[in-house]
């Protein structure tokens, strides 16, 4: 059994999708040890409780520095014998302490065809760009924002009559297929 921790900051829909794939047996030999969140009111907490997944709520402002925050996370991760970190809507850059402790073992999913539209509101950026395609990317995490080595991408059309909300749903659907597929191939 490979132990993974999932980090999320918001609604946690990708978190829940991964958990459901584990529970159904579609993702084999994986144990989700806990949800790590940096927001005490994040909806992902409710999703974790629904699936009886332990939750660690650690707000960076509780710590004197980013290094202290990350060292605390590393301690918790090591106590749970976590082997991989899966970012699922975690809205913080990963710093040197986590990167050093989990080198090559942190994955992220981003709602664009990287290297295009890094950072926040990637779907909105694609929607307003005039592009005719967008998609989702799973990549290894490095010290930059959405700059790690790309593992796999899936794409969808941006139709002239799509609303931003419709495009968000298309990309979310891609993510729900792509992330578990990549996790199954990579996390061993």
From Swiss-Prot:
The keyword Transferase applies. InterPro entries: Formyl_transf_N (IPR002376), Formyl_transf_N_sf (IPR036477), GART (IPR004607). Belongs to the GART family. The keyword Transferase applies. The active site is at 110 (proton donor). It catalyses: N(1)-(5-phospho-beta-D-ribosyl)glycinamide + (6R)-10-formyltetrahydrofolate = N(2)-formyl-N(1)-(5-phospho-beta-D-ribosyl)glycinamide + (6S)-5,6,7,8-tetrahydrofolate + H(+). It comes from the Bacteria. It comes from Staphylococcus aureus (strain MRSA252). One of its GO terms (biological process) is 'de novo' IMP biosynthetic process. Keywords: Purine biosynthesis, Transferase. Pathway: Purine metabolism; IMP biosynthesis via de novo pathway; N(2)-formyl-N(1)-(5-phospho-D-ribosyl)glycinamide from N(1)-(5-phospho-D-ribosyl)glycinamide (10-formyl THF route): step 1/1. The record marks 146 as: Raises pKa of active site His. NCBIfam families: PurN. GO terms for cellular component: cytosol. Its EC number is 2.1.2.2. N(1)-(5-phospho-beta-D-ribosyl)glycinamide binds at residues 12-14. Catalyzes the transfer of a formyl group from 10-formyltetrahydrofolate to 5-phospho-ribosyl-glycinamide (GAR), producing 5-phospho-ribosyl-N-formylglycinamide (FGAR) and tetrahydrofolate. GO terms for molecular function: phosphoribosylglycinamide formyltransferase activity. Pfam families: Formyl_trans_N (PF00551). This is Phosphoribosylglycinamide formyltransferase. The lineage of its organism: Bacteria, Bacillati, Bacillota, Bacilli, Bacillales. (6R)-10-formyltetrahydrofolate binds at residues 66, 91-94, 108.
């Amino acid at each position: 059994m490979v132990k993974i921790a999932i980090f999320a900051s918001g609604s946690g829909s990708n978190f829940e999708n991964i958990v459901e794939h584990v529970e159904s047996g579609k993702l084999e030999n994986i144990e989700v040890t806990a949800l790590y969140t940096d927001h005490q009111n994040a909806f992902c907490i409710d999703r974790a409780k629904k699936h009886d997944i332990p939750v660690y709520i650690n707000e960076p402002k509780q710590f004197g520095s980013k290094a202290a925050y990350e060292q605390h996370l590393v301690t918790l991760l090591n106590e749970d014998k976590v082997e991989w970190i899966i970012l699922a809507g975690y809205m913080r850059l990963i710093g040197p302490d986590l990167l050093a402790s989990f080198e090559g073992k942190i994955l992220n999913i981003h709602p664009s065809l990287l290297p295009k539209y890094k950072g926040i509101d990637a779907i909105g950026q694609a929607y307003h760009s005039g592009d005719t395609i967008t998609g989702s990317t799973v990549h290894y995490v490095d010290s930059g924002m959405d700059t790690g080595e790309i593992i796999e991408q899936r794409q969808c059309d941006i139709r002239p009559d799509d609303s931003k909300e419709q495009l968000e749903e298309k990309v979310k659907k891609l993510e729900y297929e792509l992330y578990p597929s990549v996790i199954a191939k990579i996390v061993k």
